[in-house]
From Swiss-Prot:
A molecular function (GO) term: 1-(5-phosphoribosyl)-5-[(5-phosphoribosylamino)methylideneamino]imidazole-4-carboxamide isomerase activity
HAMAP family the UniProt entry points to: HisA (MF_01014)
Family, as annotated: Belongs to the HisA/HisF family.
EC id: 5.3.1.16
Record pathway: Amino-acid biosynthesis; L-histidine biosynthesis; L-histidine from 5-phospho-alpha-D-ribose 1-diphosphate: step 4/9
Entry protein name: 1-(5-phosphoribosyl)-5-[(5-phosphoribosylamino)methylideneamino] imidazole-4-carboxamide isomerase
Source organism per UniProt: Geobacillus thermodenitrificans (strain NG80-2)
Chief location category: cytoplasm
Keyword terms of this UniProt record: Amino-acid biosynthesis, Cytoplasm, Histidine biosynthesis, Isomerase
Length: 245
């Protein structure tokens, strides 16, 4: 059976762990003062990967909370992937040379496709493409803008350019605990023929089991945030649920 990975999410703003509702910077809840301590807790529960997002960076277009990412990547025996505020080759190299396993490129895929293609050629599988969609269309700039490009179109273009892994976020479900948009994630996996990690809306172990059912179709994992922070289930329970045979 195809593997399925749980990615606990740590969204950072002002050096704290926060969650936003549907990407709205005015709807923030703080869940912890230390991103690295949070990463340690997830590692202790068995995480193989941790998904870290620099929300300040996404908004400002530069690295802001990068020191926490580097510290987590180097102190813990887990793989760290990071997104937010990564706009230049220097940003990509900065993280990858300092122990971070993978870098997520999101908005840049629309605003600067040449750059993204070059990064895919240079770094291969260490580049993950984040596709964030609102009603099927790609959103950019920290979700503040919506483009006229369909998620599957962007996915196909970047798969041809060498992308092997996508993170698909359905903005309508993000931070809502309303259930993931499985259909849209599977559509992207089928359109690209590549691995898609689903993000947004996971609220229960059953949601994770439901996503896991599509592992053979290319759904390679799920990013889980709010459900962990609001104690819907623990990371240890999530890992157990998706590894049941």
């Amino acid at each position: 059976m195809a593997s399925f990975t749980i990615y606990p999410a740590i969204d950072m703003r002002g050096g704290k762990c926060v969650r936003l509702l549907q990407g709205d910077y005015n709807k923030e809840t703080v869940y912890g003062d230390s991103p690295v301590a949070m990463a340690e807790q997830f590692a202790a529960q068995g995480a193989e990967w941790i998904h870290m997002v620099d929300l300040d960076g996404a908004k400002e277009g530069r690295r802001v909370n990068d020191r926490f990412v580097i510290e987590a990547a180097n102190r813990l025996s887990v793989n760290v992937q990071v997104g937010g505020g990564i706009r230049t080759e220097e940003d990509v190299a900065y993280y990858l040379e300092r122990g971070v396993a993978r870098v997520i490129l999101g908005s840049a895929a629309i605003s600067n496709p040449t750059f993204v293609k070059k990064m895919l050629q240079t770094y291969g599988r260490r580049i993950v493409i984040g596709i964030d969609a609102r009603d099927g269309f790609v959103a950019t700039e920290g979700w503040l803008e919506t483009s006229n490009v369909k998620a599957e179109e962007l996915g196909q273009m970047l798969a041809e350019a060498g992308a092997e892994t996508f993170i698909f976020t359905d903005i309508a479900t993000d931070g809502t605990l309303s259930g993931p948009n499985i259909t849209a994630a599977v559509r992207l996996a089928e359109a690209t023929g590549k691995e898609v990690i689903a993000s947004g809306g996971v609220r229960s172990l059953d949601d994770l089991r439901a996503l896991r059912e599509y592992a053979e179709q290319g759904i390679g994992g799920a990013i889980v945030g709010k459900a962990l922070y609001t104690n819907q289930f623990t990371l240890a329970e999530a890992l157990k649920a998706v590894n049941e045979r």
